[in-house]
């Protein structure tokens, strides 16, 4: 297993367009659901959530911004995967920008404030309540998990699976 992991780090793994579509679809599902679970757990323990409410505004258990962020992180850091510090720093900056402009856009365009970090843990270091130090550091760690655990696993599944089955299943999910 270690040799396969080192191969992931050291070699550019090439997939055809159809398989890449399947990889991106699976990545969107996994990271969007992960974001939903993370936010549920965080807000349950942080705010003592008394009743369950559906975060993310979807009819399925995922949050779009996590899925969008994962695609951006993949596109911006995959070639630098041998440099974890660079992956982390690029991820922190990228997710901070994504979160800031997503929050600002929803606030200004839709008139809806979906999050406000001004009162959160480590919220003192925030930008207009849309982004805070805690959130971007957590997203940086999640990005490391994405690049070094989730993507190698998805690539492994894509390589070992029948292409048609993998792509179809990924798209259906």
Model-predicted segments: where are they?
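Aromatic-rich, lipid-facing transmembrane alpha helices and their immediate juxtamembrane interface loops
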Residues: 1-173
């Amino acid at each position: 297993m270690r040799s396969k992991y080192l191969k992931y780090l050291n070699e550019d793994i090439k997939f055809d367009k159809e398989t890449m579509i399947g990889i991106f679809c699976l990545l969107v599902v996994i990271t969007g659901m992960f974001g939903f679970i993370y936010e549920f757990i965080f807000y349950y323990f942080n705010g003592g959530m008394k009743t369950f409410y559906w975060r993310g505004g979807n009819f399925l258990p995922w949050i779009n911004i996590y899925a969008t962020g994962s695609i951006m992180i993949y596109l911006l850091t995959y070639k630098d995967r041998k440099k974890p510090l660079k992956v982390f720093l690029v991820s922190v900056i990228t997710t901070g920008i994504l979160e800031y402009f997503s929050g600002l856009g929803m606030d200004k365009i839709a008139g809806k404030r979906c999050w406000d970090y001004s009162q959160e843990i480590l919220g003192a270091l925030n930008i207009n309540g849309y982004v805070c130090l805690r959130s971007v550091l957590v997203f940086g760690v999640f990005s490391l998990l994405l690049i070094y655990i989730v993507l190698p696993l998805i690539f492994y599944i894509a390589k070992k699976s029948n292409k048609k089955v993998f792509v179809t299943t990924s798209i259906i999910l």
